[in-house]
């Protein structure tokens, strides 16, 4: 009997069979079976994180409809002036101009002014301080100064130093010189060549009335003066002479 129990225990140990209180047995793990077939596809997963932009694609074909015009650009740099064009044809003749004003008040003022000028001219002529010859008027202020001062005085008054261009003008200047009994400078100056005088504007003399033997300053006397008899003499420009201007 004890031998039978021992044998039973050995078999139980070897086979690893265990029984629980519910009267069923749990055996040791068996050999794995063959894999089963694939199941049905699962549901879509959630959207992943947004990736980086991809490279630009190739340029597409031209569109069918033109785009809207762009805004005006900035003004460019002005170009070089072009060549002068040909003279155009004369325009049509304009209508006749209006007649000169016949306003009585203006005419009265004009005549009064003209009368006063004639009166002033006459008074100065009687005093010997102003003489009109042709289109010229010769006048003096009675002062004796050097040549540069005379030239400045005449310029301030709107005239020039008196310079006769014919015998009639020479006689008029001479009469003023005699009136004041003082020699006067003339509007002449000597050039680079000794004895070669010209007018202050640079034009050559078209009339002369030199005293016999004059000019003979040999380049040292750059100005010209008038004697009481109306003849001329070359003289240095620093002497005091009668101021006579022409207008």
UniProtKB/Swiss-Prot annotation:
Q: Which CDD domains match?
A: CLECT_collectin_like
Q: Which UniProt keywords apply?
A: Calcium, Collagen, Disulfide bond, Extracellular matrix, Gaseous exchange, Glycoprotein, Hydroxylation, Lectin, Metal-binding, Repeat, Secreted, Signal, Surface film
Q: Lineage of the native species?
A: Eukaryota, Metazoa, Chordata, Craniata, Vertebrata
Is Lipid biosynthesis tagged as a keyword? no
Indicate where this protein resides in the cell: Secreted; Secreted, Extracellular space, Extracellular matrix; Secreted, Extracellular space, Surface film
**Please, one GO biological process term?**
respiratory gaseous exchange by respiratory system
Please describe what this protein does: In presence of calcium ions, it binds to surfactant phospholipids and contributes to lower the surface tension at the air-liquid interface in the alveoli of the mammalian lung and is essential for normal respiration. Enhances the expression of MYO18A/SP-R210 on alveolar macrophages.
Database matches in Gene3D superfamilies: Mannose-Binding Protein A, subunit A (3.10.100.10)
Pro residues biased stretches: 53-64
- Organism of origin is Cavia porcellus (Guinea pig)
Does this UniProt record's set of keywords contain Signal? yes
Residues reported in the UniProt entry to bind Ca(2+): 214, 216, 233-234
- Give the Basic and acidic residues compositional bias ranges: 41-50, 83-92
Region annotation Disordered: where it falls in the sequence: 32-101
Q: What else is known?
A: Pulmonary surfactant consists of 90% lipid and 10% protein. There are 4 surfactant-associated proteins: 2 collagenous, carbohydrate-binding glycoproteins (SP-A and SP-D) and 2 small hydrophobic proteins (SP-B and SP-C).
Domain Collagen-like, chain residue ranges per copy: 27-99
Tell me the protein's name: Pulmonary surfactant-associated protein A
Assembly, in brief, is: Oligomeric complex of 6 set of homotrimers.
Kindly give the SUPFAM superfamilies that the UniProt entry links to this protein. Answer: C-type lectin-like, Triple coiled coil domain of C-type lectins
